[in-house]
Amino acid sequence: MARPSGQASIGTPGQARALVVPGASSDATVLEVRAQDRPGMLHELGTALAGAGISVRSAHIATYAGQTLDTFYITGSDGLPLPPARVAQAVSLVIDTCDGI
């Protein structure tokens, strides 16, 4: 199944993936995360994002058959959606955290 135009994904099957959903919110950057679930991962993600100065405005968390499907609405410290360079940083940070790096 093809990904809708305008969406960016990083990762390969079996590894953590982060999908930016452009236009999903005017108030925040929407980041969908899929990964193998493990104890403490949600806490680690929140801590990593906060450590980078990225605020989680809202999170929708789900786990199916040991796989997470978490959607984060994130903003910068100014409360605005992240600019492109910060989005790339958030994607990289989330993938590294999910992969235990």
Region locations from a protein language model:
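Regulatory modules associated with amino-acid/nitrogen control
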Residues: M1-I101
